[in-house]
Amino acid sequence: MPPPGVFVSYRREDTGPYARLLKEHLTERFPNVPVFMDLDSIEVGVDFAEAIEDALCSCVVLVALIGPVWLTTTDDEGRRRLDDPDDYVLFEIRTAMERCVRVIPVLVDGAKAPRQQQLPAHLCKLARLNALEMSYGRFEYDESRLMAAIRRVLESTADGKST
């Protein structure tokens, strides 16, 4: 059985470069821990939803990168993507919460924490989760805090404690 993993959830147009950098750093810092990020982890021809659900079954941490346009990103018809039941970011976070995966919101580049009334009903809990901030100017400091938080969850899971 593979060790518990870390899942990186993000919007490509919002925090894509941060997600890529974070995945690289997670892989370096935790070489024996699987790190799931859609572009690198889903094989060609594989069903996205199934791959995401499978990954979340083995993850103990989901890092939700929330950038300045995370809440307001729209689809081609101008509808807010978070209101689309088929939105993958919504699916990832909702599924993680349903499976009691630790969700760590990371507010990127000055993004504000979403308020409950801004979120779909099944994501309201996200507004109550303590978030970390991450910015370009303080990246090393912010990233070290995030890595320490992830390490604590991984260690508590290895010790058999609840996340």
Each PLM stretch: what is its role?
Residues M1-L71, D75-R79, P85-L90, R94-R99, ...:
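Conserved N-terminal substructure of TIR/SEFIR domains
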Residues V103-V106:
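Conserved beta-strand/loop subsegment of P-loop NTPase cores
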Residues T74-R80, L123-L129:
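Short glycine/proline- and charge-enriched loop/turn segments
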Residues K112-C124:
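Glycine-rich, charge-decorated loop segments at or immediately adjacent to ligand/cofactor-binding or catalytic sites
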Residues A131-G137:
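Short acidic-hydrophobic, aromatic-tinged amphipathic segments that line or gate anion-handling sites
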Residues P4-V6, A127-N130:
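Short amphipathic alpha-helical segments
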